[in-house]
């Protein structure tokens, strides 16, 4: 039963590929939901059986794990470890999962107890060590205890670095290096240790250069530059930007990889220059609805999010639920979303003039129940001015009218970061 449930997602996507069914986020979520339901069904069937062997109890726990029933997973794993014949890899995996579960539940006492038990036994797998310490670091950060998160984030990061030496773990190691490196940075930053926070990002950038990962190099360099700007050290950030460009050209042995890192950094140059500067009025505004036209200067005292978007932009749609939620949750606290778009001369697959495009935008706003004003410009000057060459691009302006954040895209991590920024800016007076 476990093998079927565990392989369900992989088998379904192989089936979709054979049938030439296009991948979509909705399809992924539906497939995962079906997998969880199947695992839950099999887990409950196992619960009703008597005389389960030690191995049966272990796989019953894993079925609960797939179904995301943490309480039953923990109970089954504890039942498994209480048996006298639990040794080796399965027992260690059971302990590692208990650490993860208790960390997610903010039960730090039991999480650290099982971590100590895990560390005192063999075998110890790097992937499990990384995951356990990652979850504990995240839990302490969520509990507003960044100083306690540091030791776990540091161990998770060092472990993910060690994984890069094993070719079979390199891809996973890079993914975990990014996650754990950012956890270490955030833990140090939120603990008030600026030098250590900078060091974490610098080390991650250096590691990326060493293994030829241009995307990770850019990500670490970008986060460091934004952090320096946030710290009021913009001149140091711009010097760091030039240094990162030069270093990219030297550090990567593969010229194509070096050029990719340089291209990514140059695409952000406009944003670095705009951050920590006064917001510039939007040029060429033609229509503003349903509210009355305003200037950005008149909105001082509020936190403003300029969302540069277009009706044909798929990722823009992914941002709509977040923008809607934030406008409704924080509107009475002085938060304003403005959906900034421009005339494209197209609507619903047809060429249209400006008045008809406006009517289409009004219907679009109603259809998707977007509770904020649309700002329509005559041309792309506003996009160029704010470096919104990729859509969606979000610009956050603080209560004093200063640009504090600019990012493109609508990935979950980006939306999470934007939400954190919004709450921080609203807390400022």
Predicted segments with their positions:
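Helix-turn-helix repeat elements of alpha-solenoid scaffolds
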Residues: 24-41, 65-78, 103-116, 146-162, ...
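A short beta-strand-turn-helix
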Residues: 282-304, 327-330
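Structural microenvironment flanking redox-active thiols in thiol-disulfide oxidoreductases
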Residues: 13, 318-367, 376-384
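Alpha-helical junction/boundary sensor with strong preference for TPR arrays
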Residues: 42-49, 84-85, 115, 122-123, ...
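Short active-site neighborhood of thiol/selenol oxidoreductases, capturing the structured segment around
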Residues: 293-317, 323, 337
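N-proximal helix/coil linker or "cap" segments that precede and/or mark the start of modular domains
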Residues: 229-285, 297-300, 347
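Thiol/disulfide oxidoreductase modules built on the thioredoxin-like
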Residues: 366-372, 376-423
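N-terminal leader/linker segments that initiate helical-solenoid repeat arrays
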Residues: 1-55
């Amino acid at each position: 039963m476990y093998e079927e449930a565990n392989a369900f997602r992989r088998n379904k996507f192989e089936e979709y590929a054979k049938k030439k069914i296009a991948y979509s986020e909705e399809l992924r979520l539906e497939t995962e939901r079906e997998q969880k339901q199947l695992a839950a069904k099999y887990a409950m069937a196992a619960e009703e059986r008597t005389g389960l062997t030690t191995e049966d109890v272990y796989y019953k726990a894993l079925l609960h794990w797939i179904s995301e029933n943490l309480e039953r997973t923990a109970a089954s794993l504890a039942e498994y470890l209480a048996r006298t014949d639990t040794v080796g890899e399965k027992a260690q995996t059971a302990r590692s999962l208990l650490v993860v579960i208790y960390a997610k539940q903010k039960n730090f006492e039991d999480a650290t107890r099982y971590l100590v038990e895990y560390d005192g036994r063999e075998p110890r797998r790097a992937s499990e060590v990384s995951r356990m310490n990652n979850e504990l670091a995240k839990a302490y950060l969520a509990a507003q205890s960044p100083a306690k998160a540091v030791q776990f984030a540091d161990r998770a990061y060092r472990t993910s670095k060690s994984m890069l030496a094993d070719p079979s773990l390199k891809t996973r190691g890079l993914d975990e290096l990014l996650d754990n490196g950012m956890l270490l940075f955030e833990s140090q930053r939120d603990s008030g240790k600026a030098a250590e926070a900078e060091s974490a990002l610098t080390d991650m950038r250096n590691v990326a250069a060493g293994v030829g990962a241009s995307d990770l190099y850019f990500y670490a360099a970008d986060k460091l530059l934004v952090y320096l700007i946030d710290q009021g050290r913009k001149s140091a950030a711009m010097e760091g930007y030039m240094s990162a460009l030069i270093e990219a050209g030297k550090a990567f042995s593969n010229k194509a990889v070096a050029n990719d890192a340089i291209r990514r950094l140059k695409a952000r140059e406009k944003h670095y220059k705009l951050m920590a500067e006064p917001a510039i009025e939007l040029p060429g505004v033609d229509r503003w609805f349903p509210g009355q036209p305003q200037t950005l200067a008149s909105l001082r005292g509020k936190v403003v999010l300029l969302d540069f978007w277009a009706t044909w932009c798929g990722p823009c749609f992914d941002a709509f639920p977040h923008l809607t939620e934030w406008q409704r949750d924080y509107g009475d606290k002085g938060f304003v979303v403005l959906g900034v778009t421009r005339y494209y001369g197209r609507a619903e697959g047809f060429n249209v003039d400006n008045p008809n495009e406006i009517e289409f935008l009004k219907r679009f706003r109603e259809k998707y129940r977007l509770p904020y004003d649309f700002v329509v410009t005559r041309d792309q000057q506003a996009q160029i001015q704010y470096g919104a060459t990729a859509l969606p691009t979000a610009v956050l302006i603080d209560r004093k009218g200063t640009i504090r954040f600019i990012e493109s895209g609508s990935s979950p991590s980006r939306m999470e970061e934007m939400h954190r920024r919004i709450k921080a800016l609203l807390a400022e007076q």
